[in-house]
Amino acid sequence: MRYSRLFGKTQREIPSDAETISHQLLLRSGMIAQLTAGVYSFMPLAWRSIQKIENIIRQEMNKAGCQELAMPVLQPVEIWQQSGREAPFGQTLFHLKDRKDRNLVLGPTHEEVITDLASRYIQSYRDLPQRLYQIQAKFRDEPRPRGGLIRVREFIMKDMYSFDASPEGLDDSYQTMKQAYESVYRRCGLESMVIDADSGAIGGKASHEFMIVAESGEDSIIYCPKCSYAANAEKAVFKKKTLPKETLKDLEEVATPGQKAISDVARFLAVKPENTLKAVFYMADGKFVMAVIRGDLDINEIKLKNLLKCNDLRLAEDGEVKAAGVVAGSASPVGLKNILIVADDSVENGSNFVAGANKDGFHLKNVNCGRDFRADKMADIALAAEGSACPFCDGTFASKRGVEVGHIFKLGTFLSERFGANFTDAEGVSHPIIMGCYGMGVGRLLAAAIEQNHDEKGIIWPMPIAPYQVYICGLFLDNPVVRESAEKIYAELEAKGIEVLFDDRELTAGVKFNDADLLGIPLRLTISPRNLDKGGVEFKLRRNKESELVPLDSIVERVIATIKSESDL
């Protein structure tokens, strides 16, 4: 491809609304173009990388015994009502009506459609197992699209669904997909982690996320350096600090003028934060909830949402707190009525806590769960963090940032039961099909590759997913010798099947080098009068600072050998 014919332009300035590195570099390199919030066009360079990622995915899916199909994006809302997932997805679903006033949605995922197909085409144990996948656009009305391709409203996704006759069959499908996903990321040249995850609105009994490690990732990965445990922070469990049990003391009200934050109250009363209780207020499907936790811990809203089994959970606004009769900054469950109280199990681990007196400017000393208040629900609703104790060994948690690029779920039978997707066994007994689902974000994978592979100058593409393998930088192309040499190398490489972007533009060396670094093509060949006078071509890998002069008569062989070694991942 000649750069002079390439559709798209690079830009020097960092777009003001681009927060993540990948968003900045995708826009600056001209690889994507925004149409509206969370909706992007893939320009030719990015689309070449997308196609390479899709091809790697297809190869690994096919190797794992999967069959590719295509399902409709347009779905009747009735199948979402039948599955019971219309409410959990909530406003994320794009709703529309056709000319006959029928309610439809744009598919955010395809569990409903594939289960409907399974109910029609799988009848016997002889029809099992089945593994079916597609690579297709999905639509989700994200409230805050951000991060370029990280969180968008239209995105490309590979979704695969497994159908098995037994839990052991599901385990086999699940493990096969786990290994296939790891192979995809390895072949794309990326470092990934597999971590425990929350199933969210998809549902199911178990799930794992695949994270591409990147400093600017939107997810927090909690892991133990001493053992193999790793989880998304929203799912992670940890060993909470044990407090000594004391003889219960009488409640005592004390004045705490102007002290509202836990740290301020603890300092004012000369106690440790772990000896206090804090209250956080939420609205769960429109109902006011007080969550109570030890002062040295924070609420994990995903755990709280799962415990409450609600579709919508958010922090209560000031007006809602006042309407509930709660005094923010001095609140506790002591003496409150007609309010749902949810407590973290840490409140049972300790005694004689400091908590709010439900009066502005006052707190209570010697508050004890069971004696002074009772929780309507009690469970682990605490957020794990760096420094938390590992529950599986004596290690201490560390943390990394990451970008989620894949999520796999053991769905079980809850969808097949709702759709009547049953099979008969060898004895003629009917059973619901056991399902799994496996998603992989293709556009996210592209963005995550950049988050993990870049420097201050631009993108550094791994060879397997680079839009082009070689960037030929021709300098002073008005010189006939330079032009002839550049054209000859370009033609020879293309004849060998090498993917080449030939910068044939009449621009300065500085502009060309800047664009080469920004676009991040893995291998750059610079052909100039000075290099040719020395009998060679400047050969430089994008990830290296050093370059070398390679003789003209061996440059093609050197390029082929380098591409092979860089692609064998």
UniProtKB/Swiss-Prot annotation:
Its main location: cytoplasm. Its EC number is 6.1.1.15. InterPro entries: aa-tRNA-synt_IIb, aa-tRNA-synth_II, aa-tRNA-synth_II/BPL/LPL, Anticodon-bd, Anticodon-bd_dom_sf, Pro-tRNA-ligase_IIa, Pro-tRNA-synth_IIa_bac-type, Pro-tRNA-Synthase_IIa_type1. One of its GO terms (biological process) is prolyl-tRNA aminoacylation. Catalyzes the attachment of proline to tRNA(Pro) in a two-step reaction: proline is first activated by ATP to form Pro-AMP and then transferred to the acceptor end of tRNA(Pro). As ProRS can inadvertently accommodate and process non-cognate amino acids such as alanine and cysteine, to avoid such errors it has two additional distinct editing activities against alanine. One activity is designated as 'pretransfer' editing and involves the tRNA(Pro)-independent hydrolysis of activated Ala-AMP. Belongs to the class-II aminoacyl-tRNA synthetase family. ProS type 1 subfamily. This is Proline--tRNA ligase. The lineage of its organism: Bacteria, Bacillati, Chloroflexota, Dehalococcoidia, Dehalococcoidales.
